[in-house]
Design a protein with these regions (language model features):
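Alpha-helical segment proximal to the catalytic Tyr-Lys
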Residues: 140, 184-188, 247
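Substrate-binding pocket helix/loop in short-chain dehydrogenase/reductase
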Residues: 111-112, 116-124, 150, 219
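Short C-terminal tail/terminal secondary-structure segment
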Residues: 5-13, 160, 239, 250-267
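Active-site helix of classical SDR
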Residues: 135, 171, 179
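Conserved glycine-rich cofactor-binding loop
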Residues: 21, 28-29
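Residue(s) in the substrate-gating loop at a strand-loop-helix junction
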Residues: 155
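Conserved glycine-rich Rossmann-like NAD(P)H-binding loop of the short-chain dehydrogenase/reductase
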Residues: 42-59
Length: 267
């Protein structure tokens, strides 16, 4: 006779995300794209989105050529109406939304003393206010889901100073603060809000800054694993945070960095 399990949930399905409806903001390239394909590979219904229609169409076709388990619709996190239209289209097709991933981001490298206010505000509009817009827009369907999840993508710049990217670092630090605040504020609405901090992952956003540069070489030296991250290596953390395995985790940050933040002297 089987021994009764002491757990109140089925532990065999703890990390199951099959058929969860996941919307990814900013997923036409880089880590967002890797998250889209990785989560779809685990059986989730994945709706990637972004501003670049050609790249988005190719990604949707890769996820599901028939289009039954995805939706191809551009959106812009700088525009609330665009976000709302995406939300409504997803609800019309699938009837619910379980997970929101905020991966949209821009950056630039410039001495802070010469950075214009317009440059600062433009970056904040995407990297910080865009996250807020999406969270507000998707709040109600995530609440109705009963297992709503928000996963915000932050940065090592939230913890370490990087030369001449002050606006980006400030925006991502604010994203972590927003994550903690919403994690507490929306906990009793059944929405868990967490963040992932990627380590050094070459993407379209940063490749010119870190590949074959003194900055990149220093980052590798400070990473105990001695290499850059691979896009697919961020997917595991997202699977956890999107699953029932994270139903008592909120307002927290998972760092996926090959040991960078824990590092002291590596040689």
């Amino acid at each position: 006779m089987p021994v009764p399990s002491p757990y109140l949930i089925d532990m065999s399905n703890l990390l199951e995300i099959k058929d969860r409806v996941i919307v990814l903001m900013g997923s036409t390239s880089g880590l967002g794209r890797a998250l889209a394909t990785g989560l779809a590979g685990e059986g989730a219904i994945v709706i990637p989105s972004g501003r670049r229609e050609v790249q988005l169409s190719a990604l949707c076709h890769e996820i599901d050529p028939a289009g039954n388990r995805t939706l191809c619709r551009t959106s812009d996190v700088r525009n609330r109406e665009s976000i709302d239209a995406l939300r409504d289209a997803v609800l019309d097709k699938f009837g619910r939304i379980d997970v929101l991933v905020n991966a949209a981001g821009v950056t630039f490298k410039q001495a802070t003393v010469s950075m214009s206010e317009d440059q600062w505000l433009a970056l904040m509009d995407t990297d910080l206010t865009g996250v807020l817009r999406a969270c507000q827009s998707f709040y109600e369907p995530l609440k109705q889901s009963g297992r709503g999840r928000i996963i915000n993508i932050a940065s090592l710049g939230s913890f370490r100073a990087f030369y001449q990217v002050a606006a980006y670092a400030a925006s991502k630090t604010a994203v972590l603060s927003l994550t903690r605040s919403l994690g507490c504020e929306w906990a009793r609405d059944g929405i868990c809000v967490n963040a992932i901090v990627p380590g050094v992952f070459p993407t379209d956003l940063n490749i010119k800054l870190i590949v074959g540069t003194p900055r990149g070489d220093e980052m590798l030296m400070r990473t105990p694993m001695g290499r850059f991250g691979k896009p697919e290596e961020i997917v595991g953390a997202a699977i956890l945070l999107a699953s029932d395995g994270a139903r008592f985790i909120t307002g927290q940050t998972i760092v996926v960095d090959g040991g960078y933040l824990a590092s002291g002297v590596n040689q």
